[in-house]
Every structure is written in structure tokens, then in C-alpha cells.
């Protein structure tokens, strides 16, 4: 089976490596190089770097024009495997692959069709999510289900944590799906009536309101890591929140929302909210390294009684 691989993200790297061990990859489609760092030098994504190292033909066009389509067609690929590319394909392109096209989607489809399934699951406080290997259809994320696997989301897991988990779990699921396809399995249709949808995260999610419940704030902090990252002001300094947990019991009703009310070396830095206690676990001052809550507490002047204020934005 000749496979054409499509991705632009680190989350797909382990799948790419595993496919290379078991199948012939005849080409890779990825996004163009992007400016990165202070010097804004063009940087290749990890998929492109790996493909070039393995001497695999790479395509990175802004648009899939006829010349690109013909070049891909000339490779005689049997199947296309897509994992985190970020663009929708037309029927003309999908029809190139005689054995069809499959996609790795990090949710339990039909839940969270769209571009931010990991972040959306955390933002909504889900305790369980998963990975779906689906056949591709013209309607986004509506294809037949080939393989699904559930996993738990811990209360303090971030989007980055779950992305790494998905990266590690996906290779074996993709191999299972390819084996099923080789035996003629067409997959199980989704129940479209149960479909939910998710869109791109907005930068405004990083603007926090401490009048929200600790559950909502915790979800937002963890969902927004690594982007856009939630922040608040402590006196006149920005503090970036990277990880949090919560306790939705009101112990400090008489204290201000946003006030640092306690420190527990086992649970975190306690911040009062509109409902319950937010446990800050990892924080950062702009331009400095990320600190666990103990290091932040020990390295700061008296924190108890100081109040976080919201950075302006849309709630």
C-alpha cells in the first residue's frame, strides 16, 4: 500500500514514523515554512524535516493548484492519511486515492467535529475524550468510523498534555485502521444527529474574569495551554497561568475574588473565585521560565492577601 501523508504538526510525528516502518510513503503534503523567533527566519515544521531526512517528496503549496495535483497523481498513491493539517480538501483531490482517505481526529466523533477538539473537551470540563480514525468525506469530520479509543482527562491536564497523549496513542490505532481497510472494512457511519462542533480558539479566552467559578477558570487555563495562555495582573505585573486545578466549595466567601487566600504545598496556590477555590499549579512571569507553584511562592514577596485583577477582554 502506497501512502500519501498529510500533516503540519508535531502531534502527527509518531504516526508518521510508525507508518514509515510499515508502509511505503510516496509523498508528504504539509504547510509552507513559517517565520519563527526574533529573527523571523523561515522554519520547517517537524513533519517536513522528517520527510526530507527520509528523502520523501514534499509538497508545501499555499494552494493545491492543478500542477500540484498532477504531481501527486503521478506518484500513484493508494491512500491518503491526514493528521492535523488544517485545510479542507475538494473532491477532485480526494478522488486521486483509489483506496480512499483517512483522518486521525482527536475526539470521540461525532462529538467535537472541527478544528479544536482537544481544547474544547478541556474547556467544557470533559472527563473522557478519545481518538477516532475516520474515512474522509466532503463534509468535515463526518466520515465512517474505522477505529475509536477512549482515554481519561485528568482535572489538571492541559491541551498540550492531551496532544502528547494523542500523539503516543495514535500510531497503533492507525495501523489497526489500515489493516481493516486492507480487508475491505468500510467503517461504521456516524450518528450525525449527535454531532457537536468546535471552532478556532480566540485570543480573548486568555482574558480571565475571577467572578467565574473555579471550575470554569480552571478549564480555561488548561485549555489555553499552549495557546493563547490565560493571564492576569498581580499589582502591576502580568502573570501567565499554565496549569490549574479547582475545588468548587466556597471557603472564603468574605474574601475578594481574585485574592490569593492560602498556600498548600500539596495542592497549590489558592485563589478565591466567584464560586470555589482555584488551585494555581504552574505560572510564569513574562520572559521568564515556567515555575511550579512552590517555586513561585518561595520566590515572591508576601503573596497571601494580594489580589489578581483581570486583564481586559471579552468574557
From Swiss-Prot:
Transmembrane intervals: none
Listed A to Z, the keywords are: Protein biosynthesis, Transferase
Q: List the disulfide bonds.
A: none
UniProt-listed Enzyme Commission number(s): 2.1.2.9
An annotated GO cellular component of this protein is:
cytosol
Which major enzyme category is it? transferase
Gene Ontology MF terms in the entry:
methionyl-tRNA formyltransferase activity
Q: Which domain of life is it from?
A: Bacteria
Function according to Swiss-Prot or TrEMBL: Attaches a formyl group to the free amino group of methionyl-tRNA(fMet). The formyl group appears to play a dual role in the initiator identity of N-formylmethionyl-tRNA by promoting its recognition by IF2 and preventing the misappropriation of this tRNA by the elongation apparatus.
> Which NCBIfam families has this protein been placed in?
fmt
Write the protein's name.
Methionyl-tRNA formyltransferase
Naturally occurring in which organism (per UniProt): Borrelia garinii subsp. bavariensis (strain ATCC BAA-2496 / DSM 23469 / PBi) (Borreliella bavariensis)
